[in-house]
Structure formats: structure tokens, C-alpha cells
Regions:
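Metal-dependent de-N-acetylase/amidase catalytic core
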Residues: 1-7, 24, 28, 55, ...
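ATP-dependent adenylation/pyrophosphate-handling site
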Residues: 3-11, 15-55
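Short, conserved clusters of charged catalytic residues that mark active-site
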Residues: 16-17, 59, 93
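Generic alpha-helical hydrophobic packing signal
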Residues: 32-35, 65, 204
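Short glycine-rich catalytic loops that host catalytic nucleophiles or stabilize transition states
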Residues: 37, 78-82
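Glycine-rich phosphate-binding loop and adjoining beta1-alpha1-beta2 segment
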Residues: 42-71, 75-76
């Protein structure tokens, strides 16, 4: 059994990136924790005003709880970093929050955003997670680190601007795609109409394409950032 930690920027990113994989983990007896660091609404206004958007923020938090319940997530942690403004924060402040969560949850596996992404929050969180997951002697060791793609964001980053998302790790979600799509439907304010890529149809098309890459009906794709194999006999001595 593994302890799994998903670290995402905004409500729905955790499901867009690895919702089917989360379901697979839960079904095999793993414990999954989801962390959503930014509040996900106020960037739609010229100026951040959380009081003005209080009702929408409250509803989005409820949607996140419902969506993660659909997947069987053990714990959902909602922080309130400013939406699409995380470049205005000291990166160390983001790192410290993630380090505290890692120290408490002690995950074996961490999923987070790919660096080559048009969304600034996704990039800042990728950088912070990389730092927080350093394999430092005497601290908790994250054995596996994986980066996911986020539709309507990762694919919009031009290849000359940042590293392309070129996956080298695939997860068959043919038996969990329906749960992923159901969870996304909980996000009433986030999903769009087809042919927007962040639509139910767009997510399904991507899962079919990634599945066809490996000869299955549906898949999620990742980049393996780090994989540490530990001799469990020596670890327990």
C-alpha cells in the first residue's frame, strides 16, 4: 500500500491531470491526499477581491469536496493562494507550505504539474514541489515524482518557450475514465463546452489519444521526474 499526494494549483487540475490514476490508486488500497493551493476564482476580475467572490469561492470549495469524494480521495486540503498570481509570492513561502504537508502526509508518490505550461501558477508549483521533494538524508523520502499535463494549459505553451510535455509514463484508466468524467462534472463553474479542450468531450478525447499511444482505450500520461528504488529489507533494519 502506498501513500499518494497530488499537488495541484487550482480546483479541477487534480482531476484533469490524474483523476483516473487517483481512482486506480484507491481501488488498489492506496491512500490518496489531494492538495489544491490556489483559490481558483479571483483572476477573473481586474483586481483580487475575495469578499466580492465569496459565494463563488464557497461553491467552488464544495465542488472540490464533491469531486474528490467521487474519486475516493482520503483527504482534500484547500489552501487560498491568489489565483494566477503566484508569481507575486516568494517561492520559499510556497515551498514551506508544501514541505509541511509532505512532512505530515509522508507520501511515497507525488503527482504535480509539468513545468512547460502556460499557467504561471502551474509553473511555480512545479518548481516548489521539486524543491520540497529533494532527497535529503534524515528527511522523508518521496520515492516517485510524476508530472501531469493539464488540458487547456499545457498544450498551449509554445515548444520554443519551455520544455514540451513528452510523456514517458502511462497509466491505463480504461476502467476509471467514467469516474474521472463524473468527478469533473462536479466542477460546475470550471468545465466548458466542446470544442474547448477543458470540456467533458475534450478530456475524453485526450484520454483516448493517450490510450492509443499504448494500445488501450483510455490512459493518462506523465513525465517521470524521479524514481527511487529502496531495498525494503534494509529500510526496515
Amino acid at each position: 500500500m502506498s501513500n499518494v499526494l497530488v499537488i495541484a494549483a487550482h480546483p479541477d487540475d487534480e482531476i484533469l491531470g490524474c483523476g483516473g490514476t487517483i481512482v486506480n490508486h484507491v481501488r488498489q488500497g492506496d491512500t490518496v491526499h489531494s492538495v489544491i493551493l490556489a483559490e481558483g476564482i479571483t483572476s477573473r476580475d481586474p483586481k483580487r477581491d475575495r469578499e466580492e467572490r465569496y459565494d463563488q469561492l464557497s461553491q467552488l470549495a464544495k465542488d472540490a469536496e464533491k469531486a474528490n469524494d467521487v474519486l475516493g480521495v482520503h483527504e482534500l486540503i484547500l489552501d487560498q493562494f491568489p489565483d494566477n498570481r503566484m508569481d507575486q509570492l516568494d517561492r520559499l513561502d510556497i515551498i514551506k507550505v508544501i514541505e509541511q504537508i509532505i512532512d505530515r502526509v509522508k507520501p511515497d508518490i507525488v503527482y504535480t504539474h509539468h513545468i512547460g505550461d502556460v499557467n504561471i501558477d502551474h509553473r511555480r508549483i512545479h518548481e516548489a514541489v521539486i524543491t520540497a521533494c529533494r532527497p535529503i538524508p534524515g528527511q522523508h523520502l518521496v520515492k516517485q515524482l510524476l508530472f501531469f499535463e493539464t488540458v487547456s494549459s499545457t498544450e498551449w505553451m509554445p515548444p520554443q518557450s519551455a520544455p514540451n510535455f513528452i510523456p514517458n509514463w502511462y497509466v491505463d484508466i480504461s476502467h476509471s475514465i467514467e469516474a474521472k468524467l463524473k468527478a469533473l462534472q462536479s466542477y460546475t463553474s470550471e468545465m466548458r463546452e466542446w470544442p474547448h479542450p477543458r470540456s467533458i468531450e475534450g478530456v475524453q478525447v485526450l484520454s483516448e489519444w493517450r490510450g492509443s499511444n499504448i494500445g488501450v482505450h483510455h490512459a493518462e500520461a506523465f513525465i517521470l521526474g524521479r524514481n527511487i528504488l529502496i531495498n525494503e529489507n534494509e529500510e526496515n533494519q
